[in-house]
Amino acid sequence: MAAVKQKMHVKKGDMVMVITGKDAGKKGKVLEVFPKKGRVVIEKVNIVKRHTKPSQSMPQGGIFEKEAPIASSNVMLYCTECNKVTRVSVKETEAGKVRVCKKCGVNLPDKK
């Protein structure tokens, strides 16, 4: 069965907070988004250890730490203006559509 592309409520560059799981309460910036899998990679969240054999490209080998993807349903957008997690509404303006914080009404920055 083919994966269905899921509509994501967060974008690359957004500030988010993890609301469930072992990293609940941690904040970070979204580094990567995988809409087909419904997962996101967040800076300094869900760190896993990767054991690498020595190879020509990496002669040292060893154990490296990196961020692993987590389900996008486990994160919520974090508004830096009101310092709270929030849901997003979309407002139509002359310039186009903008994302707005539901708690304080401030336009959320578009990180492109």
From Swiss-Prot:
CDD domains: KOW_RPL26. One of its GO terms (cellular component) is ribosome. The keyword Ribosomal protein applies. Disulfide bonds: none annotated. The keyword Repeat does not apply. It comes from the Bacteria. Gene3D superfamilies: 2.30.30.30. InterPro entries: KOW, Rib_uL2_dom2, Ribosomal_uL24, Ribosomal_uL24_CS, Ribosomal_uL24_KOW, Translation_prot_SH3-like_sf. Keywords: Ribonucleoprotein, Ribosomal protein, RNA-binding, rRNA-binding. Part of the 50S ribosomal subunit. One of two assembly initiator proteins, it binds directly to the 5'-end of the 23S rRNA, where it nucleates assembly of the 50S subunit. One of the proteins that surrounds the polypeptide exit tunnel on the outside of the subunit. Belongs to the universal ribosomal protein uL24 family. NCBIfam families: rplX_bact. This is Large ribosomal subunit protein uL24. The lineage of its organism: Bacteria, Bacillati, Bacillota, Clostridia, Eubacteriales.
